[in-house]
């Protein structure tokens, strides 16, 4: 039974082949060539990706941050394929640019990149690069970037979003803040290791030695410890430092000022109420000190029992200090809190 059925099945298959349309053979051949081409293209992408990752790992083994010009930026950051994330700092480190903020940000960026490079979690999923304005002007123009320094995250898939640009003006550029931002964008957690800094210890030792030496020299007469004026001056210095935002600067690590790399204009006052510069803290400290001095002079003019003419001059000087510097302080407040309706003398 099975021997008779075998020739019958072969005859039926032959009939099906005879009735197969002749136009289908080119289609099958084209489909076969397309599959071969797709397979070859995928293999080519894999080889290209492997070459890029190998090159990036080689650069990372030499330096934790590698510098890029326009061609390298387009090849390793913008062009596919990519299965890695890139953190790029756009800066202007050349001396003629006179960007002190760029140098400070570069130091923090270097600390962060070194912490990642020498950590046990280091892998080929995250790399750190840098584009200097004088080495990649075309990159700045391509990204419509008009300020430096700027930190951007380029994800492995898709285009960078708004949150992929680090808010340096509000948060500052401390390595710890950058590490937190990177963790939010890439899920890569970097523990920052800072090199030992003994300047604080040395300063504290000098201060203790100075105070100890002063107490030793004045050991027979310690009445100065009970001097109200001295303690009042110390208290005022602490109050001025805290009200000017020095603690915020210590935590956030903002730049001293901001210099526009195109026109060279330097800004000492931040335009937002959510951030400030170090220079801004110094300005506020001086203004508060001047207003306080004016108030002290007014009090002195009212309570002293000296010459009336002299007291009147002291009163006018104190009033002038309070009026002028308070008006200046209020104008800075209005520039940061847009829409604040009140002003005094200076707008």
Curated annotation (Swiss-Prot):
One GO MF term: oligosaccharyltransferase complex binding
Protein name (database record): Dolichyl-diphosphooligosaccharide--protein glycosyltransferase subunit TUSC3
Gene Ontology CC: mitochondrion; oligosaccharyltransferase complex
Family: Belongs to the OST3/OST6 family.
Function statement: Acts as accessory component of the N-oligosaccharyl transferase (OST) complex which catalyzes the transfer of a high mannose oligosaccharide from a lipid-linked oligosaccharide donor to an asparagine residue within an Asn-X-Ser/Thr consensus motif in nascent polypeptide chains. Involved in N-glycosylation of STT3B-dependent substrates. Specifically required for the glycosylation of a subset of acceptor sites that are near cysteine residues; in this function seems to act redundantly with MAGT1.
Keywords attached to this entry: Disulfide bond, Endoplasmic reticulum, Glycoprotein, Magnesium, Membrane, Signal, Transmembrane, Transmembrane helix, Transport
Gene3D superfamilies: Glutaredoxin
Sequence intervals crossing the membrane: 197-217, 222-242, 277-297, 313-333
Pfam families in the cross-refs: OST3_OST6
Secretion signal span: 1-41
Gene this chain is encoded by: Tusc3
Biological process according to GO: cognition; magnesium ion transport; protein N-linked glycosylation via asparagine
Glycan attachment residues as annotated in the record: 83
The UniProt record lists the keyword Transport: yes
Membrane topology: Multi-pass membrane protein
Pathway field: Protein modification; protein glycosylation
């Amino acid at each position: 039974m099975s021997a008779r059925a075998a020739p019958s099945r072969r005859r039926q298959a032959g009939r099906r082949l005879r009735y197969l349309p002749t136009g289908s053979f080119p289609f099958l051949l084209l489909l076969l060539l397309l599959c071969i081409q797709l397979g070859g293209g995928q293999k080519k992408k894999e080889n290209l990706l492997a070459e890029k990752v190998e090159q990036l790992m080689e650069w990372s083994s030499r330096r934790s941050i590698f510098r890029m010009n326009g061609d390298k930026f387009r090849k390793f950051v913008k062009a596919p394929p990519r299965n890695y994330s890139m953190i790029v700092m756009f800066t202007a480190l050349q001396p003629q640019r006179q960007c002190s903020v760029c140098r400070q940000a570069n130091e923090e960026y270097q600390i962060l990149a070194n912490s990642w490079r020498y950590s046990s979690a280091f892998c080929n999923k995250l790399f750190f690069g840098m584009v200097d304005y004088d080495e990649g002007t075309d990159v700045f123009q391509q990204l419509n970037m008009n300020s430096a320094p700027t930190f951007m995250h380029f994800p492995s898939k898709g285009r960078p979003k708004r949150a992929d640009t680090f808010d340096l003006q509000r948060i500052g550029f401390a390595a710890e803040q950058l590490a937190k931002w990177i963790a939010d964008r890439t899920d890569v957690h970097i523990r920052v290791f800072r090199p030992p800094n003994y300047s604080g210890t040395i300063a504290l030792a000098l201060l203790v030695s100075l105070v100890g030496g002063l107490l030793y020299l004045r050991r027979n007469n310690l009445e100065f410890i009970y001097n109200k004026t001295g303690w009042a001056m110390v208290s005022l210095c602490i109050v001025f430092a805290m009200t000017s935002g020095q603690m915020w600067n210590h935590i956030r690590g903002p730049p001293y000022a901001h210099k526009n790399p195109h026109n060279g204009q330097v800004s000492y006052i931040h335009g937002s109420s959510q951030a400030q510069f170090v220079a801004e803290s110094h300005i506020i400290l001086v203004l508060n000190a001047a207003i306080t001095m004016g108030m002290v002079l007014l009090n002195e003019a009212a309570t002293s029992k000296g010459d009336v003419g002299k007291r009147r001059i002291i009163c006018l000087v104190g009033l002038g200090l309070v009026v002028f510097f308070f008006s200046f302080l209020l104008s800075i407040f209005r520039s940061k809190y847009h829409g604040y309706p009140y002003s005094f003398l200076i707008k």
